[in-house]
C-alpha cells in the first residue's frame, strides 16, 4: 500500500505531513527497489537510470548530474554503457538501487532486494546499502523475512501480521 501498488483498505498514509493514500504510485515520491531487479534489458545502465528522470521531463543537464552522482554512490563507475546482461547479479542490484535513489525520493522502499543473491554477496551488499542510507540520510524501509538481515540492516524493526504492527 505504501508504494501505491495495492489499494489501502483502512487508514491513511501520511508522508511528510501529506496524505498520499489516494495518490498514484508515480506521484508519491517513493523510490522502489524490487526483489527482481526489473531492469530494462534493451537499455544501458545509464539509460535505465535516465528513464524515470526523462518521464519527469527534467533538463538533460540535471539528468546527467543525477546519473553521475548515483553511479558514484553505488560504485558502478565505468559500467554506464553496459547492458544488464553483461553485469553480475550484484551489479544489476546496484543499478536497481541507483534507479531508486536517482529520483531523489522522500522514502526508499526496498522489497527483499537481496533475496535472489548468494550469501557472500548479500553480506557485501547489505553493508553497501547501509552506507548509502547513512550517506544520503534517506528514510529507507527494508522489507525482509530474514531475521539476521533485519538485525544487520535496521535502526528500527517492525513486525507485521496482516498489515498490523505486532511488535
Label every PLM stretch briefly.
Residues 3:
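Helix-to-loop junction immediately C-terminal to a conserved catalytic motif
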Residues 6-7, 54:
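A position-specific signal in ABC ATPase nucleotide-binding domains
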Residues 11-18:
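Conserved ABC transporter NBD signature motif
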Residues 23-31, 35-167:
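ABC ATPase nucleotide-binding domains
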Amino acid at each position: 500500500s505504501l508504494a501505491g501498488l495495492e489499494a489501502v483498505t483502512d487508514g491513511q498514509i501520511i508522508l511528510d505531513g501529506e496524505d498520499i493514500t489516494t495518490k498514484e504510485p508515480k506521484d508519491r515520491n517513493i523510490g522502489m527497489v524490487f526483489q527482481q531487479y526489473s531492469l530494462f534489458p534493451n537499455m544501458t545502465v545509464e539509460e535505465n537510470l535516465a528513464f524515470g528522470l526523462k518521464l519527469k521531463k527534467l533538463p538533460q543537464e540535471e539528468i546527467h548530474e543525477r546519473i553521475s552522482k548515483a553511479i558514484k554512490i553505488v560504485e558502478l563507475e565505468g559500467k554506464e554503457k553496459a547492458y544488464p546482461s553483461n553485469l553480475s547479479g550484484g551489479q544489476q542490484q546496484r543499478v536497481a538501487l541507483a534507479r531508486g535513489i536517482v529520483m531523489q525520493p522522500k522514502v526508499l522502499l526496498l522489497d527483499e532486494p537481496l533475496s535472489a543473491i548468494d550469501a557472500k554477496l548479500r553480506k557485501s551488499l547489505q553493508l553497501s546499502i547501509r552506507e548509502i542510507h547513512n550517506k544520503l540520510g534517506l528514510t529507507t524501509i527494508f522489507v525482509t523475512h530474514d531475521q539476521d538481515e533485519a538485525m544487520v540492516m535496521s535502526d528500527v524493526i517492525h513486525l507485521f501480521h496482516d498489515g498490523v504492527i505486532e511488535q
